[in-house]
Amino acid sequence: MTIDNYDNSKQDSSKYEVSGTGDGRNGDGGLPLVQCVARARIPTTQGPDIFLHLYSNNRDNKEHLAIVFGEDIRSRSLFRRRQCETQQDRMIRGAYIGKLYPGRTVADEDDRLGLALEFDDSTGELLASKATTWDAHNDTLVRIHSECYTGENAWSARCDCGEQFDRAGRLIACDHEPTSNIKGGNGHGVIVYLRQEGRGIGLGEKLKAYNLQDLGADTVQANLMLKHPVDARDFSLGKAILLDLGIGNVRLLTNNPEKIKQVDHAPYLKCVERVPMVPIHWTNSSEGIDSKEIEGYLRTKIERMGHLLTEPLKLHTNPQPTETSEAQNQNRMNSALSSTSTLAI
């Protein structure tokens, strides 16, 4: 079949329905059900191509995303075979192996690579072969990132969200970051992009919180003054997406102990390492974000939300004496992992 005679009436409407894996990985134990609706290759400025996955779910009406580095990291819900679909249908929604090229007619085989996907004949489920699919036991660099319009699109110096997003991409793409001595993902990893603006309160309420901050409140106080939780995000969506992608061992890019706790879903998913996200300006004063607003933001994260950072404390925010130390960070980490004995730091 060619693009010219493709008949979109043959598309199976069930592709928009949300479904789980049926084996306890997704949709059980309080996890939301997620369904990858579409996947497409995106050439990037980071070096390797990424595959952008769009997800629906039964928890909210938002379209969450997974930015996947590595063609062989495959969504189980996307690649599952569906009744009455054609190979062209599968290619158009992104359920193909290798790369698309003009004239290609088969999604499940790539003649140029000499590889073919395998499926369970009775269920249509993708069978994970090491020759074609990323092994769940591989340690995979992961960032669970929440949407931040101001930090990612409006050059905001109130937060480091945009900086963390960009750095996560660079770390996943590289094999090693010399300045931090962090082992990169070598082209394999995932940024789960959750549409949870303003720690879950939405952009409008976040802008109101900014005004309260200019009036003297910190980020925690501002949320509470607006009758919102300190953090209203739901990281279980990220967990469900990672399970759908067949990820088992996570090297988590975070300073947030709550994310470390929430990523665990025994026996299928565990955090094997926390990779710290130290603000760039703290290690190189000529780079990164330098403002009194971001210093107050980071101080509140550390002192009021328990984030795993040690301040350099040459801040504009009239710092008071602090006992924050590596020992305190270790205590916070131990607390975060009290219910997760499998984590290796």
Curated annotation (Swiss-Prot):
It comes from the Eukaryota. Binds 1 zinc ion per subunit. Its EC number is 3.5.4.25. GTP binds at residues 143-147, 164, 197-199, 219, 254, 259. GO terms for biological process: riboflavin biosynthetic process. Residues 1-27, 312-345 are annotated as: Disordered. Pfam families: GTP_cyclohydro2. The keyword Coiled coil does not apply. Keywords: GTP-binding, Hydrolase, Metal-binding, Nucleotide-binding, Riboflavin biosynthesis, Zinc. Residues 317-345 have a biased composition (Polar residues). GO terms for molecular function: cyclohydrolase activity; GTP binding; GTP cyclohydrolase II activity; metal ion binding. Its cofactor is Zn(2+). The active site is at residues 231, 233. Signal peptide: none annotated. It is an enzyme of class 3 (hydrolase). Coiled coil: none annotated. One of its GO terms (cellular component) is cytoplasm. It catalyses: GTP + 4 H2O = 2,5-diamino-6-hydroxy-4-(5-phosphoribosylamino)-pyrimidine + formate + 2 phosphate + 3 H(+). Zn(2+) binds at residues 148, 159, 161. Catalyzes the conversion of GTP to 2,5-diamino-6-ribosylamino-4(3H)-pyrimidinone 5'-phosphate (DARP), formate and pyrophosphate. Belongs to the GTP cyclohydrolase II family. Present with 9520 molecules/cell in log phase SD medium. This is GTP cyclohydrolase-2. The lineage of its organism: Eukaryota, Fungi, Dikarya, Ascomycota, Saccharomycotina.
